[in-house]
Amino acid sequence: MSIYKVAYPDIPNMGDLINKDMLEDIFSISVKQAELKNCNLIAIGSALDQIFKSSDFKTRMKQKMITALNNNVHIWCTGFIRENLRGTSDLIYKNIHVHALWGELTRQRMEKYTGNKYDVPLGDGGLLAQRWIGGFPKKKYAVGIIPHFKEQDHPTVKKLLASYENFALIDLRDNPKDVVRKIGECELIISSSLHGLIIADSFHVPNLHITLDNKMFGDGYKYRDYYSAFGLEHSPFDCAKGDVPPIKMIRDTYSVSAEAVEQKKEALFKAFPKL
């Protein structure tokens, strides 16, 4: 059995850990967490900024070592975290094999930077989460509230909890499969975490992106990129001033179709690289 050495952060966060837990189960593979210098796959997450040469001298020196040690990397369901590179458009790897990308914004940038065309599926691998669970769980909660793992103790979260009945506060630091299942058990989801929204899409659960403040890393670009895969605009609901999204609004503004999600699931599944 080939070992998939996947580059992802070693932190307790569902959106990162599904790179191992979910991919192993769905594709019957063995996954080892790796760094850019020794990975053979970059998958779920916003890692593409890191595969281009930096303008920072110390970072460039580290990247030279990566280039010397690793020159053959597969890309599946990955995107950028920022709108602009902090460096050059030169790749640190000699050979990349692109199988799927996060969104249309990522595709356009990759084609611009590399000069290649990428006729590949678009979407996040987290859309396969429903297949990981093996079905659609019975609903237990009216609303699931998912703060980004760095915002779990944000004061606005307490106000959200007081605003809904039969809610579930979902902690992305818990066991990834338990987190995924709990999202599927909700009638609606509000989330400041992108992967909270993506997992909800996987279960066809209407959801809404909320912002708790303007301090989160990435400035919203990865959200715009994800929704560009569906041909949609990104419109977050700002909770920073104490506003709370009404239930009806969450349902009425949700526009990711179940049909589009199912099509992407199949395309992304088929596009997964065989090493």
Where are these regions (language model features)?
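Active-site anion-handling motifs in enzyme catalytic cores
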Residues: 1-275
